Amino acid sequence: MRIILLGAPGAGKGTQAKIISEKLNIPHVSTGDIFRANIKGNTPLGQKAKEYMDKGELVPDELTVEIVKDRLGNVDCVNGFILDGFPRTIPQAEYLDKVLVQMNINLDVALLIDVKDEDIIKRMSGRRVCTNCGATYNVVFNPTKVEGICDVCNSPVIQRADDAAETVLNRLETYHKQTQPLINYYEKAGKLKVAEGAGEVDETSKRVMKALGI
């Protein structure tokens, strides 16, 4: 199954992608991870992306699509993938469609994990991340056993700058302007499925599996 994951920042896409990945035995392809891997590996595509990022500029859609295309061409994507973090705009979706046609890949589902803004703000402003191992917690839903200390490696946990309430509001505003139109785009293409993302992870997972017909 070939899946694109849609949803606001903090909707739980990464968590659900991991669950789907394990259930279907297909890779979770996170564009953020691909960028980091290409830059760290000093690949030609990574070098190009780094030039833009070092100047504080956005990586052009054409280059992002090339990086995604390169990853989807890997052998582990033959039986499917979960693409998370791309596309974010209509032009990106159109670029991706062209690339998938070139690769003879048919997209099965664009899955929207739908969460209300107020729930997103609650989730994200309460999120804490370990400074060492990257483990994620939430002061309301999933607190550390010892306040401020990671359960896994005993390092300090912090609130990332982009999880502060004001920043979350700005990110949601950007999401609604840029990414929301994708919902209409994939609905018109007959690819859209929606799963309610509020509540516990297990509850959301059941709704996700139902939406995917699994």
Curated annotation (Swiss-Prot):
It comes from the Bacteria. GO terms for molecular function: adenylate kinase activity; ATP binding; zinc ion binding. Keywords: ATP-binding, Cytoplasm, Kinase, Metal-binding, Nucleotide biosynthesis, Nucleotide-binding, Transferase, Zinc. It catalyses: AMP + ATP = 2 ADP. ATP binds at residues 10-15, 127, 136-137, 199. AMP binds at residues 31, 36, 57-59, 85-88, 92, 160, 171. Zn(2+) binds at residues 130, 133, 150, 153. GO terms for biological process: AMP salvage. The keyword Methyltransferase does not apply. It is found in: Cytoplasm. Residues 126-163 are annotated as: LID. GO terms for cellular component: cytoplasm. SUPFAM superfamilies: P-loop containing nucleoside triphosphate hydrolases. Pathway: Purine metabolism; AMP biosynthesis via salvage pathway; AMP from ADP: step 1/1. PROSITE patterns: ADENYLATE_KINASE. It holds the Pfam family ADK_lid. Its EC number is 2.7.4.3. Consists of three domains, a large central CORE domain and two small peripheral domains, NMPbind and LID, which undergo movements during catalysis. The LID domain closes over the site of phosphoryl transfer upon ATP binding. Assembling and dissambling the active center during each catalytic cycle provides an effective means to prevent ATP hydrolysis. Some bacteria have evolved a zinc-coordinating structure that stabilizes the LID domain. HAMAP family: Adenylate_kinase_Adk. Catalyzes the reversible transfer of the terminal phosphate group between ATP and AMP. Plays an important role in cellular energy homeostasis and in adenine nucleotide metabolism. Monomer. Belongs to the adenylate kinase family. This is Adenylate kinase. It comes from Ruminiclostridium cellulolyticum (strain ATCC 35319 / DSM 5812 / JCM 6584 / H10). The gene is adk.
